């Protein structure tokens, strides 16, 4: 819309002026908190993925992914990420549930502390034995009445996929 005066002779040239896009890398904690701040930079430039680790109750942070369900490309803190040509890209926090094994002394005392781990991972049953006046400790069982699976100290126990597994003292 501006007026341009042609030269008296020859050719006049106008040159395009360009400014590179400023784009963003955002972090979605997917239910967690303490995610890194957004990072901005020039289009198609490289940035370093933040090493800030978000937290989420009962979950372990396993890294970032370009797709919310984890089916995209994985990134860890310190990795190089190439920003998009325009707009915003998002990295999504990936989580593994932390599950627990608890010990119910069923009237005894001195039971082992809870053990935590990743879903479906193996833990070693504690060798700590509770005590109960007038009773002999026989071991642990997955059912309070002893009708489940028996475990002794040092045995391998597979944690559940979610929640808490409990071993009950047998007297």
Regions flagged by a language model, labelled:
Residues 1-171:
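Secondary-structure capping and domain/repeat boundary segments
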């Amino acid at each position: 819309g501006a007026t341009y005066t042609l030269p008296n002779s020859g050719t006049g040239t106008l040159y395009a002026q360009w400014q590179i896009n400023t784009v963003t890398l955002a972090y979605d904690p997917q239910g967690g908190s303490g995610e890194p701040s957004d990072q901005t930079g020039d289009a198609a430039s490289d940035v370093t993925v933040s090493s800030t680790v978000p937290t989420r109750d009962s979950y372990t942070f396993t890294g970032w992914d370009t797709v919310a369900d984890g089916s995209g490309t994985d990134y860890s803190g310190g990795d190089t990420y190439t920003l998009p040509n325009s707009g915003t890209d998002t990295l999504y926090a990936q989580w593994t549930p932390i599950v627990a094994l608890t010990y119910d002394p069923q009237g005894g005392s001195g039971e082992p502390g809870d053990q935590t781990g990743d879903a479906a991972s193996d833990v070693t049953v504690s060798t700590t034995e509770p005590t109960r006046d007038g009773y002999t400790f026989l071991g642990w069982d997955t059912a309070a009445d002893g009708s489940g699976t028996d475990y002794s100290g040092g045995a391998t126990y597979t944690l559940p996929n979610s929640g808490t597994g409990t071993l009950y003292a047998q007297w």
